[in-house]
Structure formats: structure tokens, C-alpha cells
Amino acid sequence: MVLVPVLPERNRAKAADLHAPDDRLGETVGLAQAIDLDVRDAQVVSLATVRPGALFGSGKIEEIETSVAVHEIGIVIVDHALTPIQQRNLEVAWKTKVLDRTGLILEIFGRRAQTREGRLQVELAHLTYQRGRLVRSWTHLERQRGGFGFLGGPGESQIETDRRIINDRIDKIKRELETVVRTRSLHRAGRRKVPYPVVALVGYTNAGKSTLFNALTGAGVHAEDQVFATLDPTMREIRLSSGRRIILSDTVGFISNLPTTLVAAFRATLEEVINA
């Protein structure tokens, strides 16, 4: 199930997404299908007010709970950033897994990353996201333990241990990515010595950038009718019809409301666009 919340007008200036609700709905359904989910129900939900504890009002939560049961929904995707408490409360109310926009895009990126750099970037974004949800995960485990008696929930000390492990891993990945940044900087410095301009193909995800790149270069870069098919930049030297030579770069596609954790994680990749 895909839900697209439309915030009250007074909240829209602060909202991450100001796009038309139907456009958001179509895009989010496409994102869900990108990880092979069978979308059985999709709807735009207008909110009279934003509930801090669950985003939706109690009446709408009950209505969706019924729909989840009728359609036998295994996961509900909410096209909005959810706080850990909101996510937990919705999972309890609907008795199913809930994923917000950030979690959905992270899942797609995790499946698409091919190179070591790409996997590091995705892992960094995922760990940053996961770190803020340690308490939510803990309360979820505690709830399961109380209901079934076979799953021991960790105490606060376990949460702190998990947080330390995640922080250590984040620091290690950042150090590794700094090496990537330095390497890319050296490569760019080398390219500046070559009298060929760098041209980056920039656009929305699944707009056809990789297909165009292949047509111009014959590179055989993976191109498919799916979002985020390309996560790692590829460069090729080509000769234009005018005879001029350029270095053409295929890049990761953009999408509305790209989570800030992903923007930060893909710094090295995005720098190729900035420096084109």
C-alpha cells in the first residue's frame, strides 16, 4: 500500500514536497515497484492537521487499518518523512511494516549499488538513518517479547552498544570515502591538463541518461527502464560531429525530496557534476 499525505496548507511552506499529489502518488508507486513490491492500494490522504504521534488522525488510521486487513497488506509506504515514534505507532496500529520515503529510497539504492564506492555511500546513508531509529527498534522488540515471550529485548545498555558500533562504522566509512574524494580530485586535476571539457548528463532518474550515454559513446553502461539504475559515474571520451573532443559523464539521477543523508553520502559522486 502506498499513502501520499497532503499536509494542511499552513504546513506546506515547511513541507519537503510541494509537488502535485497525483504526481507524488505516481512517483511513489514507481519507487515501490522498483523493489518488486506488488502495490495493491494507493491513495492520496489529505490531512486536516498533522498529528505528532502518528502523522494521521485516529479516524484515518482506523480506515487504513481496515484496508490493510482487507487487502492483506504486508508493507505500507508513506511518502513523507516519519519520526521514529510515528513509524512505531503506525506499525503497532496497522500490524504491519511501515516504510517512509527515506527508507524506501535507501532500499532501492541498496539494491542498485554495484561498485565498492557505491556500496559504501549507500551504507553510510543507511547507518545514519538507522542510528536515529535505535530506540524505535528497541521498543518494537520489547513489544514482541511481551507478546510472545521468546524474543529478549535489549536494555538501554544494548542500545548504547549498538549506537557505538554504528558510530564506529560510520567513522570508518567516512574515512574511506575521504580517500575516494581525494582520488577523484586527483583524477579531475589530471583531466584539467587535457584540453577536453567535461560534460555531465544531468536529469531526473529514469529519464534516459544512460541510454543517451550509450548511444553517444557505445560504452554499454547498464541502462534499464527503472529508477536509479545508475549510481556510479562513468566517463568516456567522445568526438562530436564538429570534430571537437569532450569527456562525457553519466551520473546518478535526481528525484524530488532526495533524503539529505543520501545527498551527503553521495558527495564524491555529485562533485563530478559540480565540476563538469
Residue ranges and their predicted role:
Residues 28, 127, 166:
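A residue-level signal for conserved active-site and pocket-lining positions in enzyme catalytic cores
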Residues 21-24, 57, 120, 224, ...:
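Short, conserved glycine- and acidic-residue-centered signature motifs
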Residues 10, 140-276:
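Conserved G1/Walker A P-loop phosphate-binding module
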Residues 18-21, 54-58, 80-81, 113, ...:
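Conserved phosphate/pyrophosphate-binding and hydrolysis machinery centered on Walker-type P-loop NTPases
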Residues 124, 128-142:
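A charged, well-structured terminal subsegment
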